């Protein structure tokens, strides 16, 4: 299984003032790891932050599940086999704008690691941005984090 502390230290490098929270969770909304720019010392504030992050993960997982149930492929189906095969390789990624911020949800490929994660469903990466966060920077952070997490997943179960 992937180690949450290692995952958190990887994600900690990408948080900043305009990207205050990053999380990895399942499609059911179960939180695997998260990091936050703010590090409250007070126990109640830390608990409130954890509740907020879990709520975002649950909401994003639900949105992903609803989207894939109604639109299993992000591309319009064509009759050629090449296009249909390509559609299966395209992973879900979207940015949702809210009144007080943005949320990027991206699927992480777990090809070859399904047996180690005990799931065939993709992991999801959530990047929370403030209203001042640039979508392009959020997407770059998403791509880099997905690549690092995929590399980490590929080393699971291999001798060190």
From Swiss-Prot:
Q: Name one GO biological process term.
A: regulation of TORC1 signaling
Please provide, in alphabetical order, the Gene Ontology terms of the cellular component aspect for this entry.
cytosol; fungal-type vacuole membrane; nucleus; Ragulator complex
- Molecular function, one GO term: protein-membrane adaptor activity
Record's SUPFAM superfamilies? Roadblock/LC7 domain (SSF103196)
* Subcellular localization: Cytoplasm; Nucleus
Q: Is-annotated flag, keyword DNA damage? A: no
- What keywords is this UniProt entry annotated with? Cytoplasm, Nucleus
This protein's source sits in the domain of life called Eukaryota
What InterPro entries is this protein classified in? Answer: LAMTOR2-like
Question: What name goes with this protein?
Answer: Uncharacterized protein C1778.05c
